[in-house]
């Protein structure tokens, strides 16, 4: 009986995630091939969550009564995808956005990892985008004096313009692993995103953040602040789609 009840509960949660839930209705998904619902009970004590809790979360899921249900899904969408290339400038871009050649690579461009467990690379090498976005292994010391090997995997150095843009963070445009760098459409040179490209990625009109009010006066917003604003923003198109689902819920109440 307990097993039947448990299976019924799992089936119910799967139905919410895949069909009847708020996000499933707004952004339809299908269960990935051979995917199974994973279940994990959340510890009652907050301290235990911080110290010992581990869970291999999939890309979709729900939590109810302290129990996590998570499953791998794939989008059920066959319409047009807005790619990074769709929002990129096609004309001339200001020189300030371009990355100097010496800041791109410190060695052969095909190298995607560095091992610094024996010796650290020179500072000038570590200040290149190749190093920043590449895989790494280096020794670190914890607060208690324990030495350990820190490692992280490689990510794509130059973002592909034939795919949707990655999520932007507030650090966009800074020397960060998550910053987008692209090949300029006009020159082929590598550069950062412009403020207007960042706006378009998030679904805002071009130059939406160009001006701001400071002490009652309209002034141009600094580039760094414009990027921060877009990194902190929600994607307008997604919010618009969610509003439709919410509107239906309210109408049926």
Predicted ranges, named:
Residues 1-84:
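Flexible, glycine-/basic-rich loop-and-beta segments that form/coincide
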Residues 57-253:
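C-terminal target-recognition/interaction regions appended to catalytic cores
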């Amino acid at each position: 009986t307990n097993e039947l009840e448990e299976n019924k509960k799992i089936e119910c949660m799967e139905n919410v995630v895949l069909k009847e839930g708020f996000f499933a209705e707004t952004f339809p998904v299908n269960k990935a091939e051979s995917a199974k619902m994973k279940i994990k009970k959340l510890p009652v004590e907050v301290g235990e969550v911080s110290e010992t809790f581990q869970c291999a979360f999939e890309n979709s899921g729900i939590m109810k009564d302290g129990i996590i249900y998570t499953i791998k899904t794939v989008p059920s969408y066959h319409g047009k995808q807005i790619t990074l290339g769709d929002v990129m400038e096609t004309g001339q871009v200001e020189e300030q956005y371009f990355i100097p050649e010496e800041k791109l690579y410190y060695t052969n461009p095909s190298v995607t990892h560095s091992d610094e467990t024996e010796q650290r690379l020179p500072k000038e090498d570590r200040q290149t985008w190749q190093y920043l976005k590449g895989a790494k292994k280096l020794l670190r010391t914890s607060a208690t004096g324990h030495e350990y090997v820190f490692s992280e995997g490689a990510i794509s150095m130059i973002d592909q313009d034939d795919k949707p843009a990655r999520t932007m963070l507030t650090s966009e445009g800074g020397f960060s692993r998550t910053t987008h760098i692209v090949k300029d459409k006009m020159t082929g040179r590598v550069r950062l995103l412009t403020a207007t490209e960042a706006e378009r990625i998030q679904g805002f009109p071009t130059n939406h953040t160009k001006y701001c009010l400071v002490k009652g006066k309209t002034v141009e917003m600094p580039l760094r602040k414009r990027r921060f604003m877009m990194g902190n923003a929600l994607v307008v198109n997604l919010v618009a789609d969610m509003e439709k689902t919410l509107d239906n819920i309210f109408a049926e109440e």
